[in-house]
Amino acid sequence: MMKTEPRGPGGPLRSASPHRSAYEAGIQALKPPDAPGPDEAPKGAHHKKYGSNVHRIKSMFLQMGTTAGPSGEAGGGAGLAEAPRASERGVRLSLPRASSLNENVDHSALLKLGTSVSERVSRFDSKPAPSAQPAPPPHPPSRLQETRKLFERSAPAAAGGDKEAAARRLLRQERAGLQDRKLDVVVRFNGSTEALDKLDADAVSPTVSQLSAVFEKADSRTGLHRGPGLPRAAGVPQVNSKLVSKRSRVFQPPPPPPPAPSGDAPAEKERCPAGQQPPQHRVAPARPPPKPREVRKIKPVEVEESGESEAESAPGEVIQAEVTVHAALENGSTVATAASPAPEEPKAQAAPEKEAAAVAPPERGVGNGRAPDVAPEEVDESKKEDFSEADLVDVSAYSGLGEDSAGSALEEDDEDDEEDGEPPYEPESGCVEIPGLSEEEDPAPSRKIHFSTAPIQVFSTYSNEDYDRRNEDVDPMAASAEYELEKRVERLELFPVELEKDSEGLGISIIGMGAGADMGLEKLGIFVKTVTEGGAAHRDGRIQVNDLLVEVDGTSLVGVTQSFAASVLRNTKGRVRFMIGRERPGEQSEVAQLIQQTLEQERWQREMMEQRYAQYGEDDEETGEYATDEDEELSPTFPGGEMAIEVFELAENEDALSPVDMEPEKLVHKFKELQIKHAVTEAEIQQLKRKLQSLEQEKGRWRVEKAQLEQSVEENKERMEKLEGYWGEAQSLCQAVDEHLRETQAQYQALERKYSKAKRLIKDYQQKEIEFLKKETAQRRVLEESELARKEEMDKLLDKISELEGNLQTLRNSNST
């Protein structure tokens, strides 16, 4: 992810990749500060204060570079006097990424390391004459000096093609001559420096001792702090390092050629096979470095500390030391480049001074580590100059893990490119600008995030062929098995369990199951096979059969072998923390079925063995051999299975060792070994004694319990006899009650019959009563009707009597008259 910010004169610069930052830092470090641009006038020297380490490095390079003889001066004296700037040399210390170290490196220690490297590089020159001695050497100047003088003479007229061709020829000769003088350093860091190889057949290496001092001192150092009053010299992040490579370079400013296409493969990244010396020198016309910008990347980092020499009144040699540190952080990589200037002063003048290095922030880009008094226009001036690699000497150190220490290889097609005029591919040199983001129309005033509209620089990187993306060492079956186990753990219900491990252990047995177990891949899941009755797990009750053991005391048991899991469980002590995975309710996996089948198979095998032992037991019974109770008491069957005790056993067939025949060292070694075995055996005997004592106590407890049980059995027998008497009485009572019940049942049946008969009679009487009532009602009606008829007849008779009496009266009256 690239972070774009508006670039101002004081704003932070950006870089696109660690490769590019390393290249730009090298270019900026090798530019003389007094060199103006093509269309600007030269400016005054930068008045900076430098530390003593920089002066020492510069003095060493001056010793190496000012040993030219009269024969060399005859042809190149004028060139030395007229050269506007001298050739430059740098020593690069490269510390690539490694996982075993993560520590801060002191800047002063790295500068001391650069000083020792410069001493090593000075041995390339065959003349040991110091710079202060103007006496002519006893033999003609070396090819390195001739090459340097040729570069100085060709600096004013860099456009001349014939001088460039002559320089290329001399470089090829120098490359062939320096192949046998290549330096190899192998430094192995396993927490500290262990093994070192020789640099040369006759060269002693103080560099390696300083390296070890740097990394050992960095263990107790938590950070780097800049001292008061000193300019910021470098930003040194945390260093992870197993590899150290130092490069000595001589640069020449030829005319700038067109930039190479970004798709070319970098030839210098390929390694030559062991035993071959690759060509170490090349002419690399460099392109103008683009403006660095701030970049945040998670990649291996290359941090360069380059010493820039202060411009002097007369044009002279400029010696620069360049230290490159590949730093890989644990949480990501940062890019930080800093330049520490190195003026020409006597080494002994500022020897006790210490120059502190300030820690650069992770997001700072290339150029942020420069001294604060450097003006932006001076930086732009130095960026306009072009440099090319004229000489390259690699001092490589590898981690010693079976790799070659032959250094980096330059292929033969580099020479063809140089002859054809094509510049070699530089992966850090090319970039393309694309339009940035468009202006926002109406940004919210309260928003805190603003996007830059500056152009975006797109940097080229290495092609795919340069990266090793092969995975032949990955076993697909093992990887898929582990993947399936991890997916299975995600589907399980996880919960923690803590158990207290007692003398009988944890009370569980395990079984490993997983894909690829039959092919020896051993990417297994560890499941609970059985839970011992009465053990710690059984008393706790949370761990069940078929549960998956995910972790034990923080150690993951997913995708491990069964032996590893068993050793982890054996080594636990005291309170043991488990992470248990269990199938969710309603889910039935094939693991439970497999464990069940395994248990059934073991049960079947146990039954077969018991049958065999039963046959042997029958034979023993025929011979009259019986086991006594004492034997049974001495050999109890524990619920946790048989007790497995590991004891170191000496080989029985081992020959008797004679102290006279053996050497004292072997005797001491054998004695220590026997002491260890004796101590282990004593510990196991003590453990067995403790277990035997606990078993004796348990045996006494069992005897007491047996007596109590026998007494309770006698009491229960008496109770049983009483209960039997009660039961007989109850039986007779039950028989009497049964007879009475039968009689009562017979009476009940007779009464039932009488009741039914009476019920029928009652029904008959009720029917007859109904009929009688009906007859009574009919007769009453008939009587009422006859009464009415008789009454009417009486009324008629009475009327007739009264009528007759009247007639009689009238007759009497008439008669009387």
From Swiss-Prot:
It comes from Homo sapiens. Residues 480-525 are annotated as: Interaction with RGS2. Its main location: cytoplasm. The gene is PPP1R9B. This is Neurabin-2. Keywords: Actin-binding, Cell junction, Cell membrane, Cell projection, Coiled coil, Cytoplasm, Cytoskeleton, Developmental protein, Differentiation, Membrane, Neurogenesis, Nucleus, Phosphoprotein, Synapse. Stimulation of D1 (but not D2) dopamine receptors induces Ser-94 phosphorylation. Dephosphorylation of Ser-94 is mediated mainly by PP1 and to a lesser extent by PP2A. Phosphorylation of spinophilin disrupts its association with F-actin, but does not affect its binding to PP1. GO terms for molecular function: actin filament binding; D2 dopamine receptor binding; kinase binding; protein kinase activity; protein phosphatase 1 binding; protein phosphatase inhibitor activity; transmembrane transporter binding. The modification Phosphothreonine is found at T193, T207. Residues 595-816 are annotated as: Interaction with TGN38. A motif (PP1-binding motif) lies at residues 447-451. Interacts with DCLK2. Possibly exists as a homodimer, homotrimer or a homotetramer. Interacts with F-actin, PPP1CA, neurabin-1, TGN38 and D(2) dopamine receptor. Interacts with RGS1, RGS2, RGS4, RGS19 and ADRA1B, ADRA2A, ADRA2B, ADRA2C, CDKN2A, PPP1R2, RASGFR1 and TIAM1. Interacts (via C-terminus) with SPATA13 (via C-terminal tail). Interacts with ADRA2B. Residues 410-425 have a biased composition (Acidic residues). Seems to act as a scaffold protein in multiple signaling pathways. Modulates excitatory synaptic transmission and dendritic spine morphology. Binds to actin filaments (F-actin) and shows cross-linking activity. Binds along the sides of the F-actin. May play an important role in linking the actin cytoskeleton to the plasma membrane at the synaptic junction. Believed to target protein phosphatase 1/PP1 to dendritic spines, which are rich in F-actin, and regulates its specificity toward ion channels and other substrates, such as AMPA-type and NMDA-type glutamate receptors. Residues 131-141, 252-261 have a biased composition (Pro residues). Residues 291-302, 344-356 have a biased composition (Basic and acidic residues).
